[in-house]
């Protein structure tokens, strides 16, 4: 059976786990309707992007 030759140091263990944390998603308010949207993305509520309507959203 395979067994580690040396104990993994806390530093190595921490470096390995450094990518496991959850990242906080970034949101910003849509200037047109005020709903939260992802940056550099179309607003799902009103269909606006960069000050103009890209997709017409049926109400």
Curated annotation (Swiss-Prot):
Alphabetical list of NCBIfam families matching this protein: rpmF_bact (TIGR01031)
Region of interest (Disordered), ranges: 1-20
Composition skew (Basic residues), residue ranges: 1-16
Name this protein carries in UniProt: Large ribosomal subunit protein bL32
GO MF, any single term: structural constituent of ribosome
GO biological process: translation
Family statement: Belongs to the bacterial ribosomal protein bL32 family.
GO cellular component, one term: large ribosomal subunit
Keywords annotated in UniProt: Ribonucleoprotein, Ribosomal protein
InterPro entries according to UniProt: Ribosomal_bL32 (IPR002677), Ribosomal_bL32_bact (IPR044957), Ribosomal_zn-bd (IPR011332)
Pfam families in UniProt: Ribosomal_L32p
